[in-house]
Amino acid sequence: MFHGYRGSAERDLCGGVQRCFALGRSALLVDQRCAGKSGGHVITFGIRESLDCVDWANFMAKEFPDRKFILCGISMGGSTVLMAGTHPLPSQVVGILDDCGFSSPKAIIQKVIADMHLPPKLAYPFVRLGAILFGGFDPDSGSAIEAVKQCKLPVFFTHGEDDDFVPCSMSRENFQACASRKILHTVPGAGHGLAYPANQEEYLKALGDFFREDLK
């Protein structure tokens, strides 16, 4: 399970653990780069984190060769696991759960710029240049919405309809673009990252029904 921007596994993934236990599953909680107990100095909005996700998937497949896994992420972690889906993954990975991930680094950065009452189209090129010069990565080099066009794994998209940080419309865009088996589960009244707490019973039923055959 992969947490969001400037989060940590310990703080942000407690609800995810509860979901897993409710479905009779185990969970691996990952501190993403530049967070928690992990190293690193730059957050790349899921671009390099998606490669870390692939490494974790390979590690788990080696340690537990008889288990099946679902890549789960919330917020930036959701975009991370979606982007990881374009890379070669072990056969034990049977699905992806994206909880309120954004459609692309560029889209979420522009949205935050707009929230600051600045012109996104004018300001974004400077943010991008700063990321390239000082962060060593290009925000335009990765995109969840482009990744899901190549996805072959089943994807469970979920989002709170009242999310004012990552708009629910971004999950709708990702869902529409996704080429594999998919479902979009939205929760009225739920804010950012709160789709599960807002209606746990309905969430678990939808999740369990969708992945039932994959996890057999």
What do these predicted regions represent?
Residues 5-19, 32:
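The serine-hydrolase catalytic nucleophile loop
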Residues 43-64:
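Alpha/beta-hydrolase active-site loop
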Residues 64-75:
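Alpha/beta-hydrolase fold nucleophile elbow
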Residues 83-138, 146:
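Hydrolase active-site cap/lid region
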Residues 144, 153, 167-176:
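Short alpha-helix in the alpha/beta-hydrolase fold that links the catalytic acid
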Residues 150-152, 157-159, 163:
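Short beta-strand/loop motif that positions the catalytic acidic residue
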Residues 161-166, 193-194:
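Acidic catalytic loop of the alpha/beta-hydrolase fold
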Residues 190-204:
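Catalytic histidine-centered segment of alpha/beta-hydrolase-like enzymes
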